[in-house]
Curated annotation (Swiss-Prot):
Belongs to the bacterial solute-binding protein ModA family. This is Molybdate-binding protein ModA. GO terms for cellular component: periplasmic space. Residues 1-23 form the signal peptide. Disulfide bonds: none annotated. The complex is composed of two ATP-binding proteins (ModC), two transmembrane proteins (ModB) and a solute-binding protein (ModA). One of its GO terms (molecular function) is molybdate ion binding. Involved in the transport of molybdenum into the cell. The gene is modA. GO terms for biological process: molybdate ion transport. Molybdate binds at residues 60, 168.
Amino acid sequence: MSFSLSRLVVALGAGLLACAAQAAEVQVAVAANFTAPMKDIASQFEKDTGHKVITSFGPTGGFYSQIQNGAPFEVFLAADDTTPEKLEKEGGTVAGSRFTYAVGKLVLWSAKPGYVDDQGAVLKKNAFKHLSIANPKTAPYGAAAVQVLAKLGLTEATKSKLVEGASIAQAHQFVATGNAELGFVALSQVYKDGKLTGGSGWNVPGDLYEPIRQDAVILTKGKDNPAAQALVDYLKGPKATEVIKAYGYGLQ
């Protein structure tokens, strides 16, 4: 091997080692409603940065308990703003890292085309057998659904028909599989690029429920992980925010 060729091999090897050293993994807990956009964002983030994202999807309340019990998550994308704030007050986050990455929207949805009208009158007709919602105690979208029913004066009328999913993902699954005729789900689960991906739905007016501000935060376990900070920065950037808007979320 010539001297110049050997130097080239050494240089290439050093470059590969440098890239490997800079690339890192980040463990991320993600609210179930943000599953589809996060998969898109994580894929693009990995291509753009070389970092690897290990995601877990589920209910925000469940993640809070896991984090309290020492789960290895480094970044938390919640379905509300109160849970990350609570962790922040408890000293479980990196100071100054919390921000609102999306503002969620609620939709009354059915897998059946034409079943839900664009004013939500199907709720007052009360001709359905099952109405799916996420557990309001652990899932912010479930809490929002309860608020809507209360504002419409339908709490008692629908009480016996409620089917609770452990998360907004399960609440959506109940409707998608026909186990419930309709349900309150996250708009992001049934919406892409300006239209519903199937079925029929009513975009619930924002004055019927408290704003669903969804905050992200770096947890203390991610304090020294460059991939954790890189992901949070990426979520604020143009590529991620375009994905977030495409799934029907608002931005703050």
